[in-house]
Each structure stands twice: as structure tokens, then as C-alpha cells.
């Protein structure tokens, strides 16, 4: 227990002095420019995603945003004078996003500098695509999951108390004024739904309307939630262990642990609740969902569930609903992860064996990892996007009816290709073919609506080859990727293919 206390104390001692005093300096943009905030080789070279700005993040844009922040008189007047409060008026979204965006830019600077120094020590900066941690999940599913017995499907608990977010940053940041500024955002402007989404009094969920600040706060919160795993990994280093390592990126964090674990669960780090060993444990997370898979028994998974609930409750001082952790056996249940409905069913079979003149049957079982497209949630997502009704019947999309024919076909085709590309890892393609059919017929209905015709007459006039790319795009891509395949293509199309250029989940998948 003393080792755990010492580890947490040591990890939090590496605090960073924040750059808050520089917010009130006129030429902070020069400091930002010198440390890589310009467009040349910057970690922040991406769309600004600020209302009214279509440019990239640059030193000039950072200067303009920071200028808004150190106009304290303007902020005070806007709070006190409701008649002249531009935050409450039609510019509320613009100015609230500007302040939250620039705050996120500033707090990212010391963390990005730490990453740069870490990469410089290795004398070789890997390419950005090599940091995409989703690539490590696919081989884990294919190689490891079929050998495990139980899985805990975990939703990382939130909302959290606003003071918890501040305290998490306080463990690593020494600059008190910057923390006061963060409290100022939470308390004074809690009615900004685009900054943070109020759930209950003083409790907030994260909002994706401000992605920079959202990602920074969310990543800090998740790192604190998973800090115990880093401690366990270091304590178990003397045992046989293999790990894919820790990947840090601004969008998501991920860590997979494959080793023997000795778990200490304590109440507020004062007394030990239990001690147990797990012979084979895996932890995988992507975005706000994680799975904890084990080769152990169901009782062991219940201990892990109780451990997580107690850890979150004692460490973050809020009640974590046990219903957010589902324990399932692979042979009987499925679980959702990465937009797939995954399972490891047991397939019994009988093998005839013959020894001399005697023959007998040997019963055996095989386990195979399967992933399917969850058709019911996908139809719900397509229904929300107005591609079909709640029953899955395709409908026209009137919002796109005013576009040109080529634009309509391109948008439907791009949506179909993205979903087909993402769900190419499914082992059963029937649900994917149904989604393609819905999108194809929805496109035909939209074009027929535009030309004031029926779908039948429209398709007869254009021929049977119309919209054929909805079904042949994946086959064309495979023929280019694997031109020398030695077995029939129809068998290849039934196999799972994980594309490594999947760096984020499709918008429709986020509805699941």
C-alpha cells in the first residue's frame, strides 16, 4: 500500500508550471510561434473548428483569440450588464467557443513540449499514423479473444463533479491562476451548453461542440481513471509480461496490458480490501468504452467489477453505477465494441477416430471470434440521418434534393463506401448488404423526387447498371490491394478485412 501511495505521489510530483501569466502578455503569440504553433510541423495543424473561422490554426489566429481573453473589463461588463451581454446574445456561441478554444491551445503547449522532448530522446520521430492506437486492437481481437472466457463491458463513468476536473489538473499543474480560470468557466458560464453540458447541479458531462477543450479535459480524466493500471504493470514487471506500450495522442488514449496482475483495492488508500491474482488479463479501451477480458472465472470478473466501482467511488468521490459494467461469458453473450457486435461462440463437433479395428467418436469444441454489424442500431442510426424510416424502409432525403445529380450520387456513394470500409471487419456480410440496399434505394428515391418521377421509371430509364458502384466498390478495392490472391474472391469477400486507415468511427456508428 505504501508503494501505491508513493507511486501516485511521485507521478503527480511531475507538475508543470502553466502559461497562464502569458495570457496577459500582448506578444504571447510569438512564444507560441517559436514552440511550434505555426503551420510548419505543428501538432496543432488542423481545422480551427471555431464559428466564423475557416482557416487553420496559426500564430496570428492564436494571438487574436488570446486578445479576447485578457480583456478582463470586457468580460466583467458582459457578466454584470445583461442588456449588453454579447455572450447571451446571438454571438454567445462564437465568443464562448473562442474562449474555450484558446484556453485549450494554451494548456496544450506544455504537454506538447513534453511529447516533443520524449520523441527527441528516441532520436527518431515516428510517423503520425504509427501512433494510431486502433491498429493494436485488431490483432488483439483476432489472436487473443478466442482464448479468453469472460469479458467485462465497461462504460467509463461520467458526468463528474466540476471540482474533480480541476483537482485532476491540479495534481500536475502548479499554476493556481490557470485553475481559477478553469473554475471561472465552469461556475460563471455553466449555462453555455456548448462548453459543458449540465446534467445535475454542479455535475457536468462533456460536450463535443468544443472539441479542443473537450479532448483535453476528457483525456486528463481518463488518464487518471487508468493510472492504477500503469502502477500494476510496473509492479508486475518481474513476471512474464508483454505489452503493446502506451500510445498518447490528442484524440484518444489506449493501453493494452497482457500480464500477471496483483491487484490492491483500498478504501481511500487507507486500508486494503482484498488481494487477488489474475492469471491472464487484457484491458482495451477506445473512446469512452473499454473491455476487460480474462481467462479466469466469472467470480474473478465480479471481483474486478467491485474493484472498479470502489476505486471510482473512493478516488473520484462520486457514485459509479454498477450497471455500467456488464460481465458476460463469450460462449453465451455478445458485446458491443468499436461499433461491432462481437462474440466467441462454441461450435461443438464430433470427430471419428479409428484405432485398429475399433472406431469411436470424439466430441470436441472449437471457438471462433465473430463480428457482425448490429443491424437494429444501424437502422436506428440511418433513420436519424433520414435515409430510412424506423422499420428500415428506404426513404428519400429531401435535404439533398436541391443538389445536382452528381452531388447526390457522390454523397450517397461516399456514405456507403465509408460504412462498407469500416464494417469490412465483419464476419457475416448480410447486414452490410442490407445497409447498402437501403442507401442505394434511398439515393434512387431522392433522385426520383428531384425529377418528379417514380423510382421504377427512373431506374428503367437509366438501366440496371445505375448505382452499381454501391455494391462493387469494395470488390474493386480488394482487386487492387490483393491482385495475386490464390483462392477465389467470393471466399475473400466473406473474410474479415481490417483496414488500417480507419482512424475514427463513422458518424453513423457513434449513434450506437
Swiss-Prot record:
It holds the Pfam family Intron_maturas2. It comes from the Eukaryota. GO terms for cellular component: chloroplast. Keywords: Chloroplast, mRNA processing, Plastid, RNA-binding, tRNA processing. The keyword ATP-binding does not apply. It is found in: Plastid, Chloroplast. GO terms for molecular function: RNA binding. One of its GO terms (biological process) is tRNA processing. Belongs to the intron maturase 2 family. MatK subfamily. Usually encoded in the trnK tRNA gene intron. Probably assists in splicing its own and other chloroplast group II introns. This is Maturase K. The lineage of its organism: Eukaryota, Viridiplantae, Streptophyta, Embryophyta, Tracheophyta. The gene is matK.
